[in-house]
């Protein structure tokens, strides 16, 4: 649903409340939740639904760090704040258990993210990470972890304007405590801790629509093991198709086809880093990495095996011409006697010099050169993911993905991912979708951020 549709829905909700003299008891549970979220976000420095942006920039000016409150925000008596030390076994284990048991599930409660300790080490400990930005809420009496939110440092660039920022992620509250209004207090507390470090902006994403997305992308799925996906209910058998036909449709070549494609090593970092930075400049919303961040996000380390996979293509002169990466984040399969886990690969960042000779990204020849090259690269990535026992490969409609999604048999998913900026007002950025939410191969996306 687009911003205008959600704005209209909220307007109807407000009118209903006015007719009933503000009596929320006449609202459904879902309507009450939507209204509470609306009330909270109305107090925050975020863009409003349908707001006309005349000048892009910060909503509130930076404050003095010494003016930020020193004390954490008060919790209900039975809870207490806890800074989570994920370098130690028990805190990492507690975060691991909380998210695996309570984080995002699909609507039918059939699949749930299966986070690994290695994934958390990669996602939560980039260069510059701070322990105090891993915020937990424990039950005072038992010590049980019941809520978590995190921030990691990043540098954002919005239409060429750079700002020190954080990426907010992994907001999770125990299922039985979701009526306790912990989410707003978690957001306020992580904001306080980040402000204490003289950072006033944040990037975050959500499947739900809040005030107000800067960009919206759609999830897409490319089956690698169609038979297993069908067995567990991830995909259905289309009308007028047989299982044999579906298996044939999604069969990939036995080995990668791009000449010279190989795993990226530390020796490739300089060339890949330069290529990546030049490629990213075409987008209106990006994260900029320094070289140590680039190494972390694309090579990982001994704490993060089997999480991030990066590949390069080097020409005969030793120049890196292509770079592509994906990460692994499996699903736990609930209520299925045959399968316990679904292997999932996620397209991360990539870059190619295929269209660098053209000033205009949308020049027809440049577009065709890039489309052909990306199609070859991502097809090989699907083969590599299949060989790593992944069952499906996911991508958003961000970046230049709309050029290859249809040709490579990525199907549109049910889910959309909305991107938000905290304390920054900007005009919407294309997310690779047409008005009717189809892949927009003509205009593509100007959204160049991939969030975990």
Curated annotation (Swiss-Prot):
UniProt-listed GO biological process terms: protein localization to membrane
Protein name (Swiss-Prot/TrEMBL): Glycylpeptide N-tetradecanoyltransferase
Entry-linked PROSITE patterns: NMT_1 (PS00975), NMT_2 (PS00976)
Binding sites annotated in the UniProt record for tetradecanoyl-CoA: 38-41, 171-173, 179-183
Keyword Oxidoreductase: no
Gene symbol of the encoding locus: NMT1
Subcellular location, record wording: Cytoplasm
E.C. numbers: 2.3.1.97
Pfam families, per database record: NMT, NMT_C
Subunit relationships: Monomer.
UniProt record similarity statement: Belongs to the NMT family.
GO cellular component, one term: cytosol
GO molecular function per UniProt: glycylpeptide N-tetradecanoyltransferase activity
Function comment: Adds a myristoyl group to the N-terminal glycine residue of certain cellular proteins.
Keywords recorded for this protein, A-Z: Acyltransferase, Cytoplasm, Transferase
Originating species: Eremothecium gossypii (strain ATCC 10895 / CBS 109.51 / FGSC 9923 / NRRL Y-1056)
Catalytic activity: N-terminal glycyl-[protein] + tetradecanoyl-CoA = N-tetradecanoylglycyl-[protein] + CoA + H(+)
Entry annotation: catalytic residues: 452 (proton acceptor)
């Amino acid at each position: 649903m687009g911003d205008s549709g959600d704005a209209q829905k909220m307007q109807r909700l407000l009118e209903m409340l006015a007719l009933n003299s503000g009596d929320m008891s006449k609202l459904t549970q879902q309507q009450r939740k939507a209204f509470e979220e609306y009330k909270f976000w109305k107090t925050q420095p975020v863009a409003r639904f349908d707001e006309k942006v005349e000048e892009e920039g910060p909503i509130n000016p930076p404050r003095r760090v010494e003016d930020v409150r020193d004390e954490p925000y008060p919790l209900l008596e039975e809870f207490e704040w806890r800074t989570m030390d994920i370098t130690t076994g028990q805190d990492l284990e507690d975060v691991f258990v909380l998210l695996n048991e309570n984080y995002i599930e699909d609507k039918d409660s059939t699949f749930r993210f299966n986070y690994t300790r290695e994934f958390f080490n990669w996602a939560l400990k980039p260069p510059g990470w701070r322990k105090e930005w891993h915020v937990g809420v424990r039950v005072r009496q038992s010590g049980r972890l019941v809520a978590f939110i995190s921030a990691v440092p990043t540098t954002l660039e919005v239409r060429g304007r750079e700002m020190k920022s954080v990426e907010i992620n992994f907001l999770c509250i125990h299922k039985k405590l979701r009526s306790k209004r912990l989410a707003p207090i978690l957001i306020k507390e992580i904001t306080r801790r980040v402000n204490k470090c003289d950072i006033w902006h944040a990037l975050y994403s959500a499947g739900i629509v809040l005030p107000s997305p800067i960009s919206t992308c759609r999830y897409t799925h490319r089956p690698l093991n169609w038979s297993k996906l069908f067995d567990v209910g991830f995909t259905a058998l289309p009308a007028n198709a047989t299982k044999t036909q579906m298996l044939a449709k999604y069969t990939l070549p036995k080995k990668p086809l791009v000449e010279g494609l190989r795993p990226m090593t530390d020796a490739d970092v300089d060339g890949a880093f330069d290529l990546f930075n030049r490629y990213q400049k075409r987008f209106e919303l990006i994260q900029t990495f320094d070289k140590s961040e680039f190494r972390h996000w694309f090579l990982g380390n001994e704490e993060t095996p089997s999480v991030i996979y990066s590949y390069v293509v080097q020409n005969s002169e030793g120049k890196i011409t292509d770079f592509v990466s994906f990460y692994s984040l499996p699903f736990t399969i609930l209520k299925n006697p045959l399968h316990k886990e679904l292997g999932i690969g996620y397209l991360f960042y990539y870059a190619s010099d295929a269209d660098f000779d053209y000033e205009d990204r949308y020049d027809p020849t440049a577009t065709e050169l890039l489309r052909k090259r990306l199609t070859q690269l991502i097809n090989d990535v699907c083969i590599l993911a299949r060989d790593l026992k992944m069952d499906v490969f996911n991508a958003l409609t961000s970046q230049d993905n709309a050029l290859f999604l249809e040709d490579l048999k990525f199907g549109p998913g049910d889910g959309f991912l909305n991107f938000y900026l905290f304390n920054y007002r900007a005009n919407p950025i294309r997310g690779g979708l047409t008005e009717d939410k189809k892949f927009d191969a003509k205009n593509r996306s100007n959204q160049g951020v991939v969030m975990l």
